Amino acid sequence: KRAGYDPRRLDAVFVSHLHVDHFGGLPFLFIEFLHRRPREKPLHIAGPPQTEEKVRQLFLLMYGGSPARELPPVCFHILEPDQRATVEGIQVLPFRVPHQTQEISLGLKVQLAGKQILYSGDSAWSELFIDHARGVDLFLCECSFYDRGTGNHVRYIELLNDLPRLECKKLVLTHLGEEMLARKEELAVTVAEDGMVIEI
């Protein structure tokens, strides 16, 4: 809303994993589509198994009603690791990343109109990113910590060590924690900002 972007222009949303900071905005979109700006075309939502169930549960938790409560026009797609899929004309290769031990967390390599974007999702640093970043136009990589951390998020010093091996055309860091934000001016890599537009 702040950017003046009409959410009806969204064709598809890709969910990397089912932690609420990665899909918690969907109920707000649903309310917008139900009451303020009705959609004619369905919004395609693609994510790991149980995405539809979790999204519906969150919507009911936030706004009430029965399990049969109407959603705006939406179409859910299940993304399985290492199984290519096409969602609303967008080709996607999901792959499992080391973030959770039981539930599935995905990295996503998407292709549209001859351009490729790699998204790490939430993950520890992995050799998978070296492989999948090769030749992509943009690698959007989470980087929660500078040199400390819990082992399930990227640390900047690890990424920096492998920077010469990353053969992507552009690298942008996102999902920064407090330490990373405090040291943002020291970083040798572009950092994502709210409202940022990246041309590829």
Residue ranges of model-derived segments:
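Active-site glycine- and acidic-residue-rich loops that bind
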Residues: 118-124
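Glycine- and other small-residue-rich loops at beta-strand/loop junctions that grip anionic moieties
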Residues: 48, 121, 174
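Binuclear metal-dependent hydrolase catalytic cores
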Residues: 1-118, 184-200
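Cap/insert and terminal regions of metallo-dependent hydrolase folds
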Residues: 124-200
